[in-house]
Design a protein with these regions (language model features):
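Noncatalytic, beta-rich nucleic-acid-contacting surfaces in large DNA/RNA-processing enzymes
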Residues: 202, 258-259, 274-275
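Long, basic N-terminal domains or extensions that often function
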Residues: 1-2
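Short cysteine-rich loop/turn motifs with clustered Cys
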Residues: 246-269
């Protein structure tokens, strides 16, 4: 049987869907936002076809199962303060629709399409610039996504203004990777590591000039702490620490290659893949004496 149910307003339809939904799952934030965009378009006498097209593009790029994750990271990428409390869910986007876009659902949809393109580009490391591609590959090997919002924020600002260019992005990602990795090597907890992420977000989203963005990042640099951490035992049998060791080894391997080359390893990675027991590679011969190698 097919049952047709009609309600008087969207709020009632959302509640009814939760009751009747055969999956037993509530509507996701992505479901609610999509319907709210259609409702806003109807209220402002805008054609819904553009919203449908934009949303289809987002789903094709990001994937339906990752939509809520993308929307969360996108919302984080828009933060203008260091408050770690993120306004949750659907209401945050509705507030943004009214305040930033004056109810223009089409403009907001197109903005989300652009952000989804940048998010996908980061996940797939689809950059032609060799230095940028190398830094993104290194950050991706950590197996976390806390570094993605500031990178998205920089790319989104590049797309909507002429403040930054590709060379600026290369310098930004180089500075950010170095300082962010300081926190990992010093075994900082997540909230401490994220401080540089939030500082970068505040600088980018409050329209600070490029030099100020870099200065905000470099304020979190700790070269002496980083050097001291190198003498500590890095390995611990925890997933994050294992990912860190893997990321460091692969980053060392990248530095031995031409910038245009990023090798991919499958299966188990051991230290001998990167730091050979035999001192035969020119890279190591030029940098270490035999007694240092031993």
């Amino acid at each position: 049987y097919i049952v047709f149910v009609q309600t008087d307003d969207f709020a009632s339809s959302f509640r009814l869907f939760n009751v009747l939904n055969s999956r037993g799952l509530p509507l996701s934030n992505a479901d609610l936002l999509k319907n709210a965009l259609f409702e806003s378009a109807s209220t402002h006498n805008k054609k819904s076809e553009q919203i449908e097209s934009a949303w289809s593009q987002i789903e094709d790029m990001v994937g339906v199962r990752r939509l809520d994750k993308f929307l969360t990271l996108h919302k984080l990428s828009e933060k203008k303060d260091r408050d770690r409390v993120l306004q949750k869910g659907f209401e945050a986007f509705i507030e943004n629709l009214q305040q930033q876009f004056d109810g223009d659902a089409i403009a907001m949809s197109l903005m989300l399409v652009n952000s989804a393109k940048n998010y996908t580009k980061i996940l797939e490391n689809d950059f032609e610039h060799p230095s940028i591609r190398r830094k993104i590959a290194s950050l991706s090997n950590l197996g976390v996504d806390e570094w993605i919002p500031p990178v998205m924020a920089f790319m989104n600002r590049m797309a909507r203004t002429e403040d930054f260019n590709l060379d600026d992005f290369s310098q930004f990602i180089t500075a950010f990777e170095k300082v962010y990795m300081h926190g990992w090597l010093k075994k900082q907890i997540k909230s401490q590591r994220e401080m540089v992420c939030y500082s970068a977000l505040v600088a980018i989203n409050n329209d600070m000039p490029f030099d100020s963005v870099i200065n905000q990042i470099n304020q979190h640099a700790d070269n002496s702490g980083f050097i001291a951490a190198l003498d500590e035992d890095l390995y611990e049998p925890r997933p994050n620490q294992v990912n860190l060791i893997k990321a460091i080894l692969l980053r060392l391997d990248m530095e031995q290659q031409d910038e245009s080359v990023i090798k991919t390893y499958t299966g188990r990675i051991t230290i001998e893949h990167i730091l050979p027991q035999a001192l035969v590679n020119e890279y190591w011969i030029n940098r270490f004496q035999p007694q240092e190698h031993v």
